[in-house]
Structures are given as structure tokens and as C-alpha cells.
């Protein structure tokens, strides 16, 4: 068996220390997200953008105590996906030039389990219940797993720097295959005997290396500068975006708890929504986003009469830009997203069609040069990242409305990444099954986060908010308005 701490294939860019740990500088995308986290208004001991991943499981009934199997599966997960054990800022160090580092320590199986796997029960309980686990995100040096026996739910909590939503859903498939293998082979098999979809545990290089970004001192072509200027214009127009009123007296309040609302669309309703979107020639994501904007535009901007536009932060998945060898289960974890701004100006008529046109384009081709030709992310990201950081660091801008536009993360059908059940083919019942999933992104300001995905034939639209700035009594009708707007726009009536 390969040594648990020295088994991974290490890509270029990593440096091995005397103690066996591996380090590399944060890449461009990680630095971009870290800057956002550091700009957030968070009290000491809390972190913006922290992720709480909820995995509700149905496990074999003939296993009296599943905890040893879950612990073993968590260890297998660390073995095949080393980045789950990576240490990011503020817990990692900087190099001699001041660059932030990500560090993957040598794996000590017992220490890994002692520090990162906990059973939330009795006197050892850290959280009151599963919902409580997503309310406040307190950073830890490594990813943490909490098992809730009463609800058969596994909670994974991590800084967003370690993975994005697509990454954790892809890696869930790896974890579940490992868990099924542990049930099948027992607790005493060597780590490399358990089977997952990972061919070889590996540490990927940073995005800078994969995408071949030029050195920082490389001159930027004029056409790229003009394309970045175009993207920045969307941000500047977005300064005059509409917003929802926050609760009275909360404008300068410290963040409290992340809460959520959810509306479900059952299978028949989802089929009707998909058919309605096809008839209009738009994606479901575009139709939902249009409904959110339509509801925001219906609120009077009494305190900020200059608000007239709506910024649409579009999440661009960078994976299609990567060489296929990097888009495999071995490299599922990591940060491969970026936010592209698009600002709606000139009124809010024909929203579904206008947003449908935006969503139908390759997000990486939204910026264009003076001739109207698209400019690839490969060319503009280094310059755009620094320009965007400078802009966001200048907020708030005097005379402009508060900058709190709603975000939508649309993840599609999760069965693209994971299965509903894992077990031996032909068995009467699966070994283990995923009953439900949810991913909470910690909100620490008045920004409202929407998350859209479909699993087990049901589409879920989550709304995440911080209760320092909004109440459930206010937002529950807003959520219902978004639902009704979507159904009415597609000719399906309300609710």
C-alpha cells in the first residue's frame, strides 16, 4: 500500500517541505475569492462565504452502528482527495514574497479523524440541530465533518476556497463510492483497497498554471484592456441597482445568523416549467433569474431614488476552458468559478427574453474587443481580477444606493454529478442512498443568495439571508412572489 501521506501525484507548482507537507501559492481565482472574504463585514472568528454542505443519507439497516464506517469513509475521502485536508488562509503561511499559500500536510490518519470528524450527539454536540449548523460559519484549519445520528445527516463545513458547488457535488460521488466500498469490504481493508471513481489521488496545479496565464509583468494588449473596460462598465452601471429595504436600523448592524427559505417544484410542475421555457426559447435558470429581477423591480426605491438598473452577477464555470485531463474525478475539488457582471439598463420589460439571451451565450465570451469579437477569459482574467478588486474595494460610493443585488447560483440537475443510490447492482435494496442535499453559503451582509438545483425530480429554489438585515415575515412573501412570477410568465398560473 502507498503511504497515506505520500501517495498522491503532485502537479507542477507544489513544493515539498522537510516535514513532508506540500505548498503552493494561491492561484488567481483563489486570491480573487480571498479578497472578497477579507472585504466582508464579519466579526472576529467568523468567515464570509463559508460553505455548509448537508448530505441526508439512508444507510444499511443491518448495520447497528454506522459511525465507524462513516469515519473510515471520511478517511478514504482524505486519502483520494488530498485537497479536502488542505489548509488555507488565515491558517496557512505566506512565502518570502508575501504571497498567500495553500498547504497540504502529510496525512496522519488518526490525527485527521480526531480533528475533523465529530459525532453531533449528547455532550459532544456542537450544534443544536442540522439547521443550526448552517447559521454561523466559524473557520477551521481544515474541512470538518459532523454526523447527526437522529436525522442520518452528514454535514461538511469548509472555507469556500477549498471547493465550489460543482466541485463538492462531483466529490460527493467519490465519497459515496468510498462509503459503499467500506460497507462492502469492511473496516480493516487497506485504504488503497477501497474503490472510488478516483484513479490516482492527485494534487492539481493552480488555475494560473492550467490556463497558462502570462507573468504579471507581461504587457496587456489594447484589445484586452478594452474588453476589461467593457466588463467594468457593467459594474459601474450596477452601482445604481435596485435593492430590497432592510429592517429598520440595521444598515450598520453586525451580521447575525444565516437563515433560509425554500420553495419546491414537484416533478409535474417542473416538467411544465421546462416545457414553458422551451416554448420561449430560454433556459430555466434565465426564467428564474428574470422572476427574481422582476420582483426586485416591483419594490419602490423610496430612500434611493437614483436606483434604476439591476446588476446580474453571472457565475462562469471555468471547467470548460480546462484541458480534459484536469476535469476528472481525481481533480474534482478546487475553485473553478468566476463572477461575470452583466447590468440590465433601460427598464425591465421583456426580462425573460433579455436574460435568456445572456444565459444562452458562453459566459466566457461576454466581453468583447472594439471590433465586437469575443475575448477569452484566458486573456482578460489577470487584468480583470485586479480591476474588479480595486472597484469592489472602493465601495460604498457616495451618492449611490447600497450595493446589495441578489445572486443566483444555478446548479442544474445534480444527478449529472452524483447518484441517488450506491450499492451492488442487482441487489434488492441499495447499500446506501442520498435522500437530500443542501449547500449553505454563509451570508454576512444584506446580499440575498438564491440557489437553484434539481434532485430526485424536484426543483428547489433556496433563498439565503442574514437575519440581522431581514425577517422571515418580510422575505417569505418575496419568495412567494418570485415563484408566482415564474409560473405566470410561463403561462402556468400562480403557486
From Swiss-Prot:
InterPro entries, A to Z: CAT-like_dom_sf (IPR023213)
UniProt induction comment: Expression is induced in loline alkaloid-producing cultures as well as in planta.
Keywords from the UniProt entry: Alkaloid metabolism, Nucleus, Transcription, Transcription regulation
One GO CC term on file: nucleus
SUPFAM superfamilies: CoA-dependent acyltransferases
Function: Transcriptional regulator that may regulate the expression of the loline biosynthesis cluster 1, one of the 2 clusters involved in the biosynthesis of loline alkaloids, potent insecticidal agents composed of a pyrrolizidine ring system and an uncommon ether bridge linking carbons 2 and 7.
PANTHER family in the record: CHROMOSOME 7, WHOLE GENOME SHOTGUN SEQUENCE-RELATED, CONDENSATION DOMAIN-CONTAINING PROTEIN
Name of the protein: Loline biosynthesis cluster 1 transcription factor lolU1
Gene name linked to the record: lolU1
